[in-house]
A protein has these predicted regions:
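N- and C-terminal low-complexity/disordered segments
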Residues: 3, 16-118
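Sec-dependent signal peptide recognition
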Residues: 1-8
Length: 118
């Protein structure tokens, strides 16, 4: 039992190999209007803002695994509703699991599709 506990401590202290990531020049996002069913795809450069209806969507960064450009993209976004003072979403969203950090809005969903790769 003591040996097992010591092994767990050693494994916890050993850093995991970090996955190398690359920042893309931009990304692709999808916006869904849950009332009308309208879907809009956005292609944004890093730092660019686009309006979709009452939403203003800004892409801060889009990153992907360096060794697998088609792999799991994740993007940092800031989204405002009707030019409000406070964003309805600010943070990172993972393309393969947008629900992990989802935008909470009664009418709109926004999620990452992919990063633009060279």
């Amino acid at each position: 039992m003591i040996l097992r506990a010591a092994l767990v401590c050693v494994m916890a202290a050993t850093p995991l190999a970090a996955q190398q990531v690359t920042s893309a020049p931009g990304g692709e996002l999808r916006v869904l209007d849950k009332i009308t069913g309208e879907v809009t795809d956005l292609t944004l450069a890093t730092g660019e803002t686009q309006k979709v209806g009452p939403l203003s969507v800004t892409l801060g960064d889009c990153r992907y695994p360096t060794d697998n450009p088609a792999g799991n993209a994740y993007a940092e976004m800031t989204i405002y509703y009707r030019d409000g003072a406070d964003p309805v979403f600010r943070g990172w969203m993972i393309a393969s699991a947008p629900a992990l950090n989802a935008m909470e809005h009664p009418r709109y969903d926004v999620w990452v599709l992919r990063c633009m790769t060279p």
